[in-house]
């Protein structure tokens, strides 16, 4: 069979090639999110003003994740501790900025003459802010859409208040006081319920205007926290230690790959075996890093450990496969090559099942700080079993001429 024909038949090799291309493109365009330990940043330990239920704690995590992601932060990790503490880790974030966003209750109210007309519960969606230059600085606006009930309540006030201000508060701080236009009041009086509203503000610089608008948008989109959060500790984490660890891990990985290749070449007395091993191992690393880049998954120390573990378990599988193909051939066993490979893959699959079961328990158990470890380990092992191990076996057969 020609080399091209063999490649067409072995679709897994085409998958590996595609993975290399997609991963390289994604890394060049998007890069990869690094965790707090590798990039540095801020860790905030906060306490709720009263013990909360599990449901309320889960809601707190959801609100904070939405708020911080909307603001533009990447690599966020939030870990509840008990019923009244929460740890928030934000790579590359200034401490003051982090604390302000985390501790904002997010309570929105629109009042007319001191009486609440609409609240955050009446907001259906929030659009991206708009910034425009005006005399003396910059004006920002954050448009949002009311629910049908919110629009009804707003119309009840608007129809009798032409030219009057509606004061909008966020956490009891007035952020905007737009006036009800004559046209809006007349439309409300005729039964029209306006659902498109906006909060307007201003700042001296464009950067300040963008920040204020993004903060309003993030808080409105995420909603109100079920309990007030009080910071108990704010820590700036240096990236030096993590970066040194990352460099050492890369160097150690390269040395380990080279050492394994040499040892296997000596063991089986054939230097040609080293090539497929290096190709297979590097393909799995590229897959995992590319996957993290594409999905926005954060590579922190646990995730890095998961990558190392999946590669280590992969080397074990390669040795099992090599032993069956090479040594089985030399022993001239009365067993066909297909049967020997089948025997090797039964061991590989059993190893994967055991590893996946252990990692699944770790993931489901809710140990948030170790989920990255479990995800990377399972993803790497799965890709290896389905794609790279079969390709390795085929490459080895072709190189050794045992087909």
From Swiss-Prot:
One Pfam family hit: SecD_SecF_C
Chief site of localization: membrane
GO cellular component: plasma membrane
Alphabetical keyword list: Cell membrane, Membrane, Protein transport, Translocation, Transmembrane, Transmembrane helix, Transport
GO BP of this protein: intracellular protein transmembrane transport; protein targeting
SUPFAM superfamilies in alphabetical order: Multidrug efflux transporter AcrB transmembrane domain
Cited InterPro entries: SecD/SecF_arch_bac (IPR022813), SecD/SecF_CS (IPR022646), SecD_arc (IPR024912), SecD_SecF_C (IPR048634), SecDF_P1_head (IPR054384)
Membrane topology field: Multi-pass membrane protein
Subcellular location, record wording: Cell membrane
Transmembrane segments: 13-33, 245-265, 285-305, 306-326, 347-367, 368-388
Stated role: Involved in protein export.
Cross-referenced NCBIfam families: PRK08343.1-4 (NF006218)
Subunit comment: Part of the protein translocation apparatus. Forms a complex with SecF.
Family: Belongs to the SecD/SecF family. SecD subfamily.
Name of the protein this chain belongs to: Protein-export membrane protein SecD
Source taxonomy: Archaea, Methanobacteriati, Methanobacteriota, Methanomada group, Methanopyri
Gene: secD
């Amino acid at each position: 069979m020609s080399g091209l024909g063999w490649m067409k038949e072995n679709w897994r090799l085409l998958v590996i090639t595609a993975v290399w291309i997609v991963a390289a493109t994604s890394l060049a365009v998007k890069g990869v999110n690094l965790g707090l330990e590798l990039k540095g940043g801020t860790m905030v330990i906060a306490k709720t003003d009263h013990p909360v239920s599990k449901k309320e704690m889960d809601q707190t995590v959801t609100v904070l994740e939405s708020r911080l992601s909307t603001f533009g932060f990447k690599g966020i990790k939030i870990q509840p501790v008990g019923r009244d503490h929460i740890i928030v880790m934000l790579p590359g974030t200034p401490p003051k900025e982090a604390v302000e966003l985390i501790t904002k209750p997010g309570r929105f109210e629109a009042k007319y003459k001191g009486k609440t007309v609409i609240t955050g519960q009446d907001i259906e969606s929030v659009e991206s802010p708009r910034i425009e230059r005006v005399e003396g600085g910059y004006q920002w606006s954050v448009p949002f859409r009311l629910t049908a009930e919110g629009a009804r309540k707003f119309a009840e006030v608007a129809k009798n208040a032409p030219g009057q201000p509606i004061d909008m508060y966020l956490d009891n701080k007035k952020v905007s006081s737009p006036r009800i236009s004559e046209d809006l009041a007349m439309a409300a009086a005729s039964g029209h319920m306006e659902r498109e509203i906006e909060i307007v503000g201003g700042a001296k610089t464009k950067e300040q205007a963008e920040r204020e608008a993004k903060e309003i948008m993030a808080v409105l989109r995420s909603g109100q926290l079920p309990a007030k959060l009080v910071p108990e500790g704010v820590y700036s984490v240096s990236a030096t230690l993590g970066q040194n660890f990352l460099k050492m891990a890369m160097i150690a990985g390269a040395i380990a790959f080279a050492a394994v290749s040499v040892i296997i070449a000596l063991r089986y007395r054939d230097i040609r075996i080293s090539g497929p091993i290096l190709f297979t191992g590097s393909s799995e690393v590229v897959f995992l890093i590319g996957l993290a880049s594409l999905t926005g998954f954060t590579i922190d120390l646990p995730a890095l450990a998961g990558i190392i573990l999946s590669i280590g378990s992969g080397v074990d599988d390669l040795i099992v496969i090599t032993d069956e193909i090479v040594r089985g051939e030399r022993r001239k066993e009365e067993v066909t090559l297909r049967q020997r490979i089948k025997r090797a893959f039964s061991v590989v699959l059993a190893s994967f099942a055991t590893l996946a079961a252990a990692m699944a328990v770790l993931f489901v158990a809710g140990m948030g700080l170790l989920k990255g470890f479990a995800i990377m380990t399972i993803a790497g092992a799965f890709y290896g079993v389905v794609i790279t191990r079969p390709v390795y076996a085929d490459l080895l057969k072709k190189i050794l001429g045992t087909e």
